[in-house]
Amino acid sequence: GIGMGLVRMVRPWNEWLIVWGYDINGPEPEVTEEFATGVARQLIGDPDLKIELLNANTWTVNNFYATRTSNGRVFCMGDAIHRHPPSNGLGSNTSIQDSFNLAWKLAMVLKGQAGEALLDSYNTERAPIAKQIVTRANQSIGETGPIFAALGMTEGVDPVQMQKNLEARSDGTAAAEAQREAIRKAIAFKKYEFDAHGVEMNQRYRSDAIVTDGQIEPAFELDSDLHYQPTTWPGARLPHAWVYDRETGAETSTLDLCGHGSFTLLTGLGGEAWVAAAEAVAADLGIRLVSHIIGPRRPFVDHHGDWARVREVKDSGCVLVQIGRASC
């Protein structure tokens, strides 16, 4: 782990979760009420604190991902294919994304709307994501160490010495100035854990279920871990933009125009031919498809031009969106 204890509220104000490290090279500790009380007192700083131990178990930081997520009729997801520390908050998100990716594909195959080869794309699309998020979460743990080093908290666990090291940063000496600079740099680097929007938002699928039609993948203009770069390039998640109901003025996200068990075609004025062609193909294949022509005097209007800025096609072009809300 990161070498630091944790106290987290479960229910205010009388139920708490405490995380405490132990040496994995030795035996697992027996977490008795006496042991747990000692840990709680040390973390909170109250030598007379009394607790009621509800439950205890041991857990080890994992650095594990599956390179293959399916085999025959067996499909795995969630913790079965990626296990990692809680850094970056990627656990539940990624598990839900796994199921979201697989569910609509299974439904189409079971309904006879797609061949079984569609299920191969689950492995092709999600296995690289498993590797990516496990790598990122474990890297974030390693990036915590410089903070403790800069604070002088890596030289033992004596509380008096630790407090002395912390107070040293308040001195007017050159050494204290260097310490303050080291602290600033170490904390700033944690943006890769707490502000890394691109880690998830920039994920792009590549599989036989994605048709690029020869389009060149857009390069990332900024750090792809930190900064989300909206794109409708096939395989990327559909960008959010507010569009407005012509009749009521209510705002609706482009994300909410899509999904709901249907493929979606988004186009603008002059894109009627795309609508006719897509609806004909959908009818022939027996699949659900919803079309939206976004523009003036249409059911949905792009008043602020937000959709026009991120769609990467002209008014007369189109974006075809999977049931899972990725461009395809």
Give the role of each language-model region:
Residues 38, 42, 108-327:
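Helical substrate-recognition/capping region of FAD-dependent monooxygenase/halogenase enzymes
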Residues 1-175, 203:
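Core Rossmann-like FAD-binding/catalytic domain of the broad FAD-dependent monooxygenase superfamily
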